[in-house]
């Protein structure tokens, strides 16, 4: 895509996550890659889950390992519950622990009419975007300790809806409610759960979802007049994963360039 999404190459870490390990779904590109890079710069070992974008995943791996930490690449389909359990186990086996789970992977399809959404598309969108988060979170929690963190990528569309992403928006609403609920359930164990709700962000999903006019106008309706970059969305994931976010749980952090200004 042109221009390429901006990644946080100039960020200077301060060991906020030193000694921790993280599993990030959709970590091969976009927000997931930016989060992986920041976590590495803050001292965490990182496991990357992705479908089949092996070249992209290798780019992320190289960037992570350049920071002197480990990176584990874990390809496969997160629609499969057994694969999700395997992701968690392989992360624990490789790093000895799992402190941070970032449920980030998602798919979306432009459909202007409800009748155009097939049953198969609806089911797949929920399986990738939401069911995987249930599978992964359920598998991860037994390995997590007090102070550990679960972070899910929601969306501005969970709050305002979107007439061309009806099924996608519904999954993001489900993620928001699920995150708030598990935050309440896991508080007694000292495990925090939060979400980040991006607005328009310049990732590979955009040119694969929109036509040329849609890509050109993407993000122009925000107060900032442009889409956000992955590097601009990734910082809240560091806060929520670190001890500096120790009093934050059950919350959604909105990063949307002013596209949504209501509570």
PLM features: what roles do these ranges have?
Residues 8-9, 111, 160, 238, ...:
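Short C-terminal tail/terminal secondary-structure segment
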Residues 54, 75-88, 119, 231-232:
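The beta1-alpha1 cofactor-binding region of Rossmann-like NAD(H)/NADP(H)-dependent oxidoreductases
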Residues 112-114, 118-126, 218:
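Substrate-binding pocket helix/loop in short-chain dehydrogenase/reductase
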Residues 137, 171, 179:
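Active-site helix of classical SDR
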Residues 142-143, 184-188, 246:
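Alpha-helical segment proximal to the catalytic Tyr-Lys
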Residues 155:
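Residue(s) in the substrate-gating loop at a strand-loop-helix junction
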Residues 222-233, 244:
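A conserved structural motif in NAD(P)-dependent oxidoreductases
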